[in-house]
Amino acid sequence: MKEETISVIIKPLVKSGVYKNEEVALKDIVVNHIESKISNYEKTIKKIENKYNMSFEELTDELKNEAHFEQEEDWMDIKGAIVMKEAWEKARESLIKENNYV
């Protein structure tokens, strides 16, 4: 995305007084998006852990013995959510570290 396109999208937020400047607006929007992604993956993880009343690690051990189709699908969903949550957490950490953003 070109810098001018980003500016066109962000400028109304600055003009309306919601943000001090475009840089602050963009950083806040990106951090909020990352936080939303992390929260959604945490909900997915918690939902599946609650469904089986066990942690991902316990579910993994349980499925080694015998798994049914639905359990395998749930395991793949929770595994994917864990991987993506960790990726978004790394992205957030990198953004904060590289931009001195708190």
Q: Model regions: which residues?
A:
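Charge-rich amphipathic alpha-helical interaction elements
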Residues: 69, 76, 80-83, 87-94
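Amphipathic alpha-helical coiled-coil segments and their boundaries
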Residues: 20-23, 27, 34, 64-67, ...
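Small, basic N-terminal interaction modules of short regulatory proteins
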Residues: 1-60, 86, 90-102
